[in-house]
């Protein structure tokens, strides 16, 4: 039995090729424990050429409130970040539900609200000219008491370039 477990462990080590898997608490690098990574989306393919982008949903361990951010990375270099609202303090029941790759970039899906109104927002981010741009926002408002659902499509007149620090609450308007 012990030999079988040892063999399984050795095979697993070779399969991982020395890469360590941490579930729950990952950091951007071994010496940087500031970020608690909750989700990572690797963007690869013909659209991006030889570049390897990562979109990461992280929490700041140095912040008392553990504020969330969406980090845009080109390799190991961060070139933009979305500052997310604090749950229940700045935005009731705010949560990042998913990051999904699309044909032209990626989509960030967030929900917030509770009681009378529940919101689902889809931020559509497109990649063109070697940059990411916020292209459109799809908002769904659901009123549980009335059983109504309203969907709003907002295409940006001038797409917002993902560069530097951007606060998400500004995008909710």
Question: Residue locations for each model-derived region?
Answer:
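Short, surface-exposed coil-to-beta transition loops
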Residues: 65-67, 94, 117-122
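Acidic, small-residue rich beta-repeat scaffolds with periodic aromatic anchors
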Residues: 20, 24, 28, 102-173
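Sec-dependent N-terminal signal peptides
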Residues: 4-14
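Beta-propeller blade termini
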Residues: 25-47, 91-104
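Acidic/hydrophobic-patterned starts of short beta strands in beta-sheet-rich repeat architectures
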Residues: 46-58, 101-112
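Structured domain cores in non-transmembrane regions
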Residues: 77-102, 109-113
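Beta-propeller blade repeat segments, especially FG-GAP/WD-type strand-to-loop junctions
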Residues: 65-82, 124-128
């Amino acid at each position: 039995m012990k030999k079988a477990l040892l063999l399984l462990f050795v095979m697993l080590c070779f399969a991982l090729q020395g890469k360590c898997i941490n579930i729950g608490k990952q950091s951007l690098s071994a010496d940087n424990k500031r970020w608690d990574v909750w989700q990572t989306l690797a963007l690869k393919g013909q659209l991006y050429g030889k570049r390897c982008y990562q979109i990461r949903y992280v929490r700041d361990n140095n912040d008392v409130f553990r504020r969330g951010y969406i980090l845009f990375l080109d390799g190991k270099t961060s070139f933009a970040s979305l500052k997310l609202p604090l749950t229940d303090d700045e935005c009731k029941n705010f949560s990042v539900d998913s990051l999904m790759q699309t044909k032209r970039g990626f989509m960030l899906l967030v929900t917030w609200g509770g009681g009378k109104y529940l919101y689902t927002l889809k931020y559509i981010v497109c990649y063109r000219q070697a940059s990411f741009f916020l292209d459109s926002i799809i908002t769904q408002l659901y009123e549980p008491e009335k059983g109504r659902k309203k969907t709003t499509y907002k295409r940006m007149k001038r797409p917002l370039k993902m560069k530097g620090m951007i606060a998400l609450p500004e995008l909710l308007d």
